[in-house]
Amino acid sequence: MHKIVLVGLLAWVAGIISVSAETLRVVSYNVENLFHPKHDTIWEPNPNPSLKGREIFIEKDDYEWTPDGERRWSYTRYYRKVENIARVLTNIGEWDGVDIVGLQEVENALCVKRLCYTLRPGEYDFVHYESPDPRGIDVALIYKKSRVDTIATRAIRVKPTPNPSLKGRGDELITRDILYVCAKIKAKSEGVKANGDTIHFFVCHLPSQRGGVAETEWKRDAVKKILQGGVDSVLAIDPQAKIVIMGDFNGEPQPSEGGGDPGDGLRGVSYQEPVNGKETGTHKYHGRWSCLDHFYTSPSLDSLSRAEIYNAAWIQEPDEKYLDLKPKRTYNGFRYQKDGFSDHLPILLKLKIKN
């Protein structure tokens, strides 16, 4: 089993990190329920071999996020949400803008297309596949066309998986796909020779802990095995391949080798130490910060790569019950907040691209 190394990429980084002309800015962001207001449906290949070629019609369970649903999710609120997320990404990207964004919890291509247009019209494109997730939330990847050429893309399907402890009875895992994108990186500035680095990106959103951490661990383990298989397939062709895995893993990083993130043989380093005595993380639940959102890279990537949690005060709000701050969500319970963003903070990876 090939090894990939977590190199301090889920982290806080105090101070400002200087960015060279050839730094690639990669963001991972769970944008929490970015739904299109129109009820959505998808067509899926028929699993019956005798009916191969005939698609089946699947309705998404997204009625809560429609104008007549519980959230009263209007087009005005939808557009405002997209604008808010775009504002976060614009601030992370600073003057030059972000180069690549791995998104979690987007409903469909319309949402991602709208976000690309809102960021900078004409500058960004995206990769998205519909997945069988019952609620209809998927992962996607946005990229700046001037810096990235996609070579190959595919959705890695997580097949329906039974709970091993129930021996095939009861609970079954049906979840999001893993998105794979093979991309060639282009030089940022004129006069700089493009190195043509090829990087393999995996975007993930593992099943939640709803129902209990231990009780749902088998679901996340099942997805990690599929992810590890995808990584192994890349490394089997090129042992020196440059790989970036990003996403919401719905669990803390495992610092020890063989810790199970996202497959056997991992060696992980997490940066969760307090800053100025304050706890930090990407998600806060009942007053406790957790680092649920991770970056992983292969050893072949530049060791100077750095990462940080983007925790600007303006995308947070006072935590009146548990004190300090917490991510500012679009909905606080069922109370709509027009200047809300997500229940997760985004994470930024600064990759040094050699010329």
Residue ranges and their predicted role:
Residues 100-102, 106-198:
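Structured beta-strand-rich core segments of catalytic domains in phosphoester-bond hydrolases
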Residues 5-15:
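Bacterial N-terminal signal peptides
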Residues 40-45, 196-225, 229:
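Metal-dependent phosphoester/phosphodiester hydrolase catalytic core
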Residues 31, 106, 206, 248-249, ...:
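Active-site metal-binding loops of divalent metal-dependent hydrolases
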Residues 25-33, 152-154, 198-208:
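Active-site-proximal beta-strand elements of phosphoester/diester hydrolases
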Residues 108-110, 134-136, 209-211, 250-256, ...:
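Active-site environment of divalent metal-dependent phosphoester hydrolases
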Residues 25, 173, 186, 221, ...:
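Metal-dependent phosphoester-hydrolase catalytic domains
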Residues 19-118, 129-137, 189, 195, ...:
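N-terminal, active-site-proximal structural segment of metallo-dependent hydrolase catalytic domains
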